[in-house]
Amino acid sequence: MTNVSIHPSVDDGVARGGAEDFQGGTLECHCASDKVTVEVSAQTAHNHACGCSKCWKPDGAKFSVVAVVPRDNVKVTAHPEKLKIVDEGATIQRHACTGCGVHLYGRIENKDHAFYGLDFVHTELSKQQGWSAPGFAAFVSSIIETGTPPEQMDGIRTRLTELGLPPYDCLSPALMDALSAHVARKKGLLH
């Protein structure tokens, strides 16, 4: 086994599967008091380790762990006044706590985007067990943009593979197919 730290929630192995009847839980920021809380009332999908430079990562982690859930199942339940969008120009509008910096959820507002209607959440912010498990790693090469030396990439890809997280330098094939099919439908090439 390769000794490379990916993310605290997967470094000791990925817990497989989520509870079939799991109906969500509460995400909490890291503030000591007056926590921002977000209720997620559904099971997540497409959970993955993400190496992009935009996603929130805990201290020392090379990757975030992030999943999607229908936006209608995401509701801020405490301290919405503490949330601020990190980058107004980004496709995913990441709502972060102004107190601790944790990203509570990300939302795509562009109705023409293939993933419109899905919110991005970090289930590690929840105390509840049963969330879907990470199944792949996306935007792996992007960790170089945040300071990882390129010569470490072979070891990182090896570690991701050992953890059962196939490494991609984009999204998983199923998600890339969904994006491409969305474009083809908009062009009238698919129905």
From Swiss-Prot:
Keyword Metal-binding included in the entry's annotation: yes
UniProt-listed Enzyme Commission number(s): 4.4.1.22
Domain of life: Bacteria
Binding-site list for Zn(2+) 1: 29, 31, 97, 100
InterPro entries reported in the protein's UniProt record: CENP-V/GFA, Formald_GSH, Mss4-like_sf
Pfam families to which the protein is assigned, alphabetical: GFA
Protein name: Glutathione-dependent formaldehyde-activating enzyme
Organism: Xanthomonas euvesicatoria pv. vesicatoria (strain 85-10) (Xanthomonas campestris pv. vesicatoria)
